[in-house]
Amino acid sequence: MINCVNESTLSWCNDKGENMTLTHQISRRLALALVASASLFSSVSIAAADKIKVAAIYTLPVEQQWISRIHKALNSAADRGDIEYTFSENVANTDYERVMREYAEQGQQLIVGEVFGLERAARKVAKDYQDTAFLMGSSFGGVGPNFSVFDNWIHEPSYLSGMIAGAMTKSNKIGMVGGYAIPEVNRLMHAFMDGARDVNPDVKFMVNFIDSWYDPPKAKESAFAMMDAGADIMYAERFGVSDAAVERGIKAIGNVIDTSGDYPGTILASALWHMEATIDKAISNVVSGNFEASDYGQYSFMAYGGGSLVMDESLVPADVASSVKAKQQEILDGLFRVNVNDARPQSDG
């Protein structure tokens, strides 16, 4: 029960989040006395309602590109005073379930993380702590009553970045280096390939996965091999690819974060992920008592501000930039839908 009061009436929210009002007039002193008494039996104080406790569990450092987007959004919420935020990073899959339970036992109201490598164990924890809200990056759906899922559905800006690459390649060969061939990665790569092919039917792709989320030397080595085979633009799904592009003097397309400042003159464009819309919706649902099992993936769409394209117009020709902006508007207006393909992408030829 969340209590609130003004001078003439007593209002409160019941456990279902419904607004309740005492209809007869009462004195300020009586109102305050009633609130003080009710607060003894209330599980959530006014202060706690304004600032909920949120914990995040990351399997990689918070600097890693995908993780950094979640961490940034949660820090923004903390800076606004909406949440008390704590986190654990570099948590091994073997320790993940234990850390989830520890945070739940501590009374964290919302636990955020990514459970691609331990789907079954994570759902078991959520079932054991049904008063805790869980929001997890996952390849599968949510499960009631309290386990929701999300992912970086930035296939739309990925398609747009593919248009740029397809229009600008001179060799008609584009290299693509990914981490793991999982649906979350595959759909972005396919969207990029579709965008490139739609403006350049002759383009061919070389695709490789390094089977790691963070191995820049291995990604760099794979990129060099593709460049040696004629690729003149690289899709940098993982760190290390853009470093190779800089060394060889070719262009690259970024993913999830904007690294153009780190690689000036190299990054043509990047498909960016903004986790704020997802996090803010989850926080709002927890505060209102409306959090339930659902898929928050839609909040990564461009229409919700969860995805965007950034391009370096000093590197991208004006006519190409104009075409991309027009297609972006079609997406935002609901006139063009980017295809979603979760299958493992393959090299051409």
Where are these regions (language model features)?
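Extracytoplasmic "Venus flytrap"
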Residues: K53-A73, A77-R80, T86-Y96, F116, ...
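An alpha-beta-alpha
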Residues: L74, L160-V203, V207, D295-V316
